[in-house]
C-alpha cells in the first residue's frame, strides 16, 4: 500500500506579484506562550485541511511562528473616511496577508493573520489583538456565513500568555481570517488622494481580472464593474437589515470591494426592535446606527465613486450609483416577504410589515423571537403564538386579522409555509451576551461554551432542542450592549 500523501495548501500570491508598491513585506511577530484554542472544522474542510493541521507542530502556522511553502507575508496599505471624515493613510495595522490559497474549485482565498504584530501602518497601535475581540470576530463571521450573508470567514483562534494592555490587561490572541479578497474601498481612496491615477487604474484592472474576468476588455468594463460593486453592497445592506445586524463601524476602510461583511468590531444583533440601535459606544452621533446603515453604505459608495472618477465619466458614475436604491429595495422586499411567509406580492404587504414593526417598537418586542414565532402561525386558527407577547391585544388582534387574511391568498398549505418561513427566520443569532459568556469562559481556558455556541450558530434556522437556552430572550443586563472599538 502506498503511503498517504499529505495535502499541502497551494499559494499563488497575485497581490504580491502584480501590485508592487501597494504593500510592505514583513514577517508575523509571534506571541509569548501561543497555543491553538479553537478552529472551525467546517471551514477547514472547505480549505482541504484535515485534523492533523490543528495539532502540533502544525499549529505554529496559526500562531505566526512558521510559514508554509509559497506564503509571501505582507501588510496592505490603504486609506479611508472614518465617521465621515477623511482619515488619511491607514493600512493593515495589526494584520498580515500570509498568502492566497488556490482551491480545487479554482477560487482563491486570502489567509490573513490578525494580531500578527507591528507593521508600518500600526500608527499608535501595538499591532496586537486581544482574545475577546478575536472570539467575537470568529463567532460573528461564522454566524453570518451560516445565515447566508456574504462575509469573511474565521478559521482559527490562537490564545497566549502574552499580556496586552487596553482598558485593562488582556490576553493576546491571533485570528486566521479567510476571504476571497481583502481589498477595500479605502485601497482606491489611498491612491486617488495621493494623486496616483495610474495606481488607481492598476488596482481596478487587477480586481476586475481577478473577480470579474467576464468584463476584461469590455469598452465599459469600469462602469459594469462599479455597478456590480454598488449592487452587491446594496444586497449586503438588505441582508444586514433583514436579520437585525448592526456592524458598528462602517468606515470606508472597512467596506469590501466584493460586497462582503468584514472587519468585525463593535457589532451587535438587535434584541428588542429598536431601529436607532447604536452598538458602538464611540458612535456618539449615531452615524452607524442600525437604521442608518443603508444610507451610510451609499455615502461610502459615493466616496469610492469619487476615487474612481478618473476611470469613468460623471454620467457613468451616476448611472452606476443609481442602481443602489432599486437593488436594495428589491432584495429587502424579497427577504422581508419571505420572513412574513408571502410568496406572491400584494399591495398590502408593506402596510402589514410596517404595522408589525410599529407594534414591536411600541412594546419593545424582540426582533428575532417575534419573526420566529410568526413562523408557527396556522392560517385557519384565530389563536396566535405571538398574542401573549403583546400588551395591547386589541392592536395586535387587528393586525393579526389582516395578516391571516393575507396568508389565505397564498397557494401553499400551512406546513409548506411554516417551513419556508423558518428558513427565513433564524432561531439562533449571536447575541452579545452569549458572546460575552463564551469569552469569559475561554479566558479561563474553558472552550465548551464557545464550542457549543459555534455549533448552534451553524444551523441557525433549525430547531435544536439541546440549544434552546441559546434561543432564549436575553436577560435585562444583556440587552442592547454597546461595545468598545478597542480590540
Curated annotation (Swiss-Prot):
What does UniProt list as catalytic? 253 (proton acceptor)
Q: Where are the transmembrane segments?
A: none
Reaction equation(s) it catalyzes = L-seryl-[protein] + ATP = 3-O-(5'-adenylyl)-L-seryl-[protein] + diphosphate; L-threonyl-[protein] + ATP = 3-O-(5'-adenylyl)-L-threonyl-[protein] + diphosphate; L-tyrosyl-[protein] + ATP = O-(5'-adenylyl)-L-tyrosyl-[protein] + diphosphate; L-histidyl-[protein] + UTP = N(tele)-(5'-uridylyl)-L-histidyl-[protein] + diphosphate
Residues holding ATP: 91, 93-94, 114, 126-127, 177, 184, 263
- Top-rank taxon: Bacteria
Q: Per the record's keyword annotation, is Cell division included, yes or no? A: no
Q: Pfam families this protein is in?
A: SelO
Q: What is its EC number?
A: 2.7.7.-, 2.7.7.108
User: Where is Mg(2+) annotated to bind?
Assistant: 254, 263
MF-aspect GO terms: AMPylase activity; ATP binding; magnesium ion binding
Q: Coiled coil located at which positions?
A: none
Q: Which UniProt keywords apply?
A: ATP-binding, Magnesium, Manganese, Metal-binding, Nucleotide-binding, Nucleotidyltransferase, Transferase
Cited function: Nucleotidyltransferase involved in the post-translational modification of proteins. It can catalyze the addition of adenosine monophosphate (AMP) or uridine monophosphate (UMP) to a protein, resulting in modifications known as AMPylation and UMPylation.
Q: HAMAP family in the record, alphabetically?
A: YdiU_SelO
Report the family membership.
Belongs to the SELO family.
PANTHER family named in the record = PROTEIN ADENYLYLTRANSFERASE SELO, MITOCHONDRIAL
Q: What is this protein called?
A: Protein nucleotidyltransferase YdiU
User: What is the scientific name of the source organism?
Assistant: Yersinia pestis (strain Pestoides F)
Upper classification of the source organism reads: Bacteria, Pseudomonadati, Pseudomonadota, Gammaproteobacteria, Enterobacterales
Identify the gene encoding this protein: ydiU
